[in-house]
Regions:
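Surface-exposed, low-complexity/disordered Ser/Thr/Gly/Pro/Asn-rich loops and linkers
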Residues: 77-140
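Catalytic His-Asp segment of secreted/periplasmic serine-dependent ester chemistry enzymes
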Residues: 350-481
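Oxyanion-hole/transition-state-stabilizing segment in secreted/luminal serine hydrolases
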Residues: 289-324, 334, 347-350
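Serine-esterase "nucleophile elbow" of acetyl-processing enzymes
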Residues: 49, 223-281, 294-302
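Short, surface-exposed beta-strand/strand-loop-strand elements in extracellular ectodomains
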Residues: 156-175
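Sec-dependent signal peptide cleavage junction
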Residues: 19-35
Length: 633
């Protein structure tokens, strides 16, 4: 297994098998009615949610509020015991913090007339139903195909509910949907558990999925029943991209405006329900990536789609470097009969002039469009281009216009936790949901007949859902973040979210390596960070500053990161000294790239080498000599 969590769950499974607590699935029979017409059903599970001691509906297994997945192991709830924080947030996208326990209760009634939902509140007064999802999981086989029918209802049958339902790693099926008192809402969708590769965040490597997840959140929300069928294969919509595309795992309390979430996550709300969406994106990637690409290449099949969206992290090679990597994606799709969708990157919100947000990444849009057009001209019929870049910019400016020209209005779709500055690159859950809808609109607007036909199986069957805008109840409280953001402070002695562990220079005196540690801290890591190295001469006079070209990424979670590209106009010479600090960055795109944000938010303590006068010559893995200053931090 890849980590201790998996070992823990395996141990719990062994115990459950000995005690006989596991309920095995019913083998499908000729009388089994498939959830989706035409499916061949191999196995089936039916769960009825209610209080202990009540009777389950005929043919269903009773799930009670104390059915804990970790101890029951075959199925049950996540996040319901003191040790839940050790599970992390990679199973269903939600993660308990130390000291948090989700409290569940049944609503009353028998059979399918009962339900289970989150109740109570945490020590900061955050309501359980709103901020602590009811998180159900079924042990499942990776690489297998599942259909799900979930029925939600109101926990208190005398009151209305506002419910959001998620699957897998916080993929929305529907959000903020009103369910009237005592009524139900049933939805059917598809899930393909798939290992996910993590290159930038820890623990690293290929991490098993192994679950079908169904979670609900929202005022008075509850799960009434879930039916799951393991079936033969069906189409999959694969997603590759960077931090603006990847799944955005979060820590509780859950609030849609305080978590990084990529556009790929939001797609599940609109994709045809007979497609499963698998997001293999990760923060910090660009189109040259191979690890995540190979995860898809080794699994994609005829009839599948591959969505590829890159651009933000091509800071050193630009659109030319981006487009030079696209052939491998097309060849992988073409060889198996799948369809490639090249998607231009979402825009940033950091360039506001003349009353409107401006393009910073349109060079990638132009390059991607030309690449696809050239392929089509050469005879390709299994590729399409979708201009999300322009549609995202139009969305930002519409929000601004609709709010009287207020440029801060769109920040509600990018602002995350309090205290770390406004992120200008990464959408939150609300932003991802709306930007995914812009993809839907852009895909429907494709006019080239070849590309339009390639997209037709998806575009002609989009689910009829629309995005939810941030409510005026939130925006009326002031600029983001405001008092609507839930209060929750994790005790920590760390002042800064980033620690610089090492800085290295090559023989020419050029900075070429930095190692940093991202950690929980009193200051929130709210946006990209930029390493700034200040060089002084032997008299203590400043010679200039060296700036990292690559960001310290705030979207990949805690752990170490390595930065290898820096500006070279200032060099460290014999007798010089230096210090380094991580500041909040502004990502300008184009030739400008990262700069220090005017807000001047400091993300690290000042890094001071132990010996500012002497250096040691090292060789890196390629045999290049380096100046290696050791830190005393």
């Amino acid at each position: 297994m890849k980590n201790n969590v998996k070992k823990l769950l395996c141990a719990a499974l062994s115990t459950a098998m000995i005690t006989g607590s596991i309920v095995l699935p019913m083998t499908a029979s000729a009388e089994t009615t498939p959830i989706f017409d035409g499916d061949t059903v191999e196995q089936e599970w039916k769960f009825d949610f209610g209080a202990a001691g009540t009777n389950a509906e005929d043919g269903y297994t009773l799930v009670t509020p104390d059915t804990n997945y970790v101890t029951n192991k075959e199925y049950g709830f996540l996040g319901v015991d003191e040790g839940s924080y050790k599970l992390g947030n990679r199973f269903d996208g939600f993660g308990n913090q130390k000291g948090q326990v989700i409290k569940l209760a049944a609503g009353g009634g028998e059979g399918l007339n009962d339900a289970i939902g989150s109740v109570g509140e945490d020590s900061f007064g955050n309501a359980g139903d709103v901020y602590y999802p009811t998180r159900f999981a079924l042990k499942a086989d990776d690489e297998a195909y599942y259909r799900v029918r979930a029925t939600v209802t109101t926990l208190d049958t005398t009151k209305d509910a506002e419910i959001s339902l998620y699957t897998e790693r916080k993929h929305p099926i529907f959000t903020d949907t009103k369910v009237e008192a005592g009524q139900t809402k049933t939805v059917e969708f598809s899930v393909r558990p798939t290992p996910i590769y993590y290159e930038k965040s820890e623990p690293k490597g290929e991490i098993a999925d192994g679950m079908v997840n169904v979670c609900v959140a929202g005022k008075n929300s509850a799960i009434a029943s879930i039916e799951i069928q393991k079936v033969q294969e069906y189409p999959v919509f694969w997603v590759l991209g960077d931090s603006t595309v990847t799944d955005g795992n979060c820590s509780l309390p859950f609030f849609r405006l305080q978590n990084y979430t990529g556009v790929g996550t939001g797609l599940t709300k609109y994709l045809p329900r007979n497609y499963a969406m698998v997001n293999e994106g990760e923060g910090g990637l660009n189109a040259a990536d191979n690890y995540h690409f190979n995860m898809v290449k080794n699994r994609i099949k005829k009839g599948d789609f591959l969505y590829v969206e890159y651009g933000h992290n091509h800071k050193s090679d630009g659109p030319d470097g981006y487009v030079s990597n696209l052939d491998k994606y097309y060849n992988a799709c073409h060889s198996v009969g799948a369809t490639l969708v090249i998607v231009s990157p979402i825009e940033r919100i950091n360039t506001f002039t003349d009353g409107a947000y401006q393009h910073t990444l349109d060079g990638f849009a132009t390059a991607g469009a030309k690449y696809v057009a050239d392929k089509v001209t050469a005879g390709a019929t299994d590729i399409a281009y979708v201009d999300l870049n322009s549609y995202s910019l139009d969305f930002y400016n519409k929000i601004t216009t609709d709010n009287g020209g207020d440029s801060g209005a769109i920040k509600f779709y990018f602002q995350t936790a309090k205290g770390g500055g406004t992120d200008q690159t990464h959408p939150n859950d609300a932003g991802a949901e709306n930007l995914a809808y812009e993809f839907v609109k852009a895909a429907k607007a494709v006019t080239d007949e070849i590309q339009k036909a390639a997209l037709a199986p998806v575009v002609n069957n989009f689910t009829d859902e629309t995005p939810n805008l941030v409510s005026t109840e939130i925006t009326s409280l002031g600029s983001a973040p405001n008092s609507a953001w839930p209060q929750y402070v994790v005790p920590t002695d760390n002042e800064y979210p980033v620690v610089i562990k090492d800085i290295k220079f090559n023989e020419a005196g050029e900075a070429n390596y930095a190692k940093v540690l991202v950690q929980d801290a009193k200051i929130d890591f709210g946006a990209y960070g930029i390493i700034v190295i200040t060089v002084k001469d032997e008299n203590g006079e400043e010679k200039g500053k060296i700036y990292a070209i690559d960001q310290v990424d705030n979207s990949t979670g805690n752990g170490t990161q390595e930065i290898t590209h820096f500006t070279t106009d200032v060099k460290l010479e014999e007798g010089d000294t230096y210090t380094a600090t991580v500041w909040k960055a502004k990502d300008n795109g184009g030739d400008t790239g990262l700069t220090v944000d005017p807000e001047n938010v400091q993300y690290s303590a000042e890094y001071i080498p132990t010996d500012e006068e002497q250096y040691l010559l090292n060789e890196d893995k390629d045999g290049n000599e380096q100046f290696d200053f050791k830190s005393n931090i």
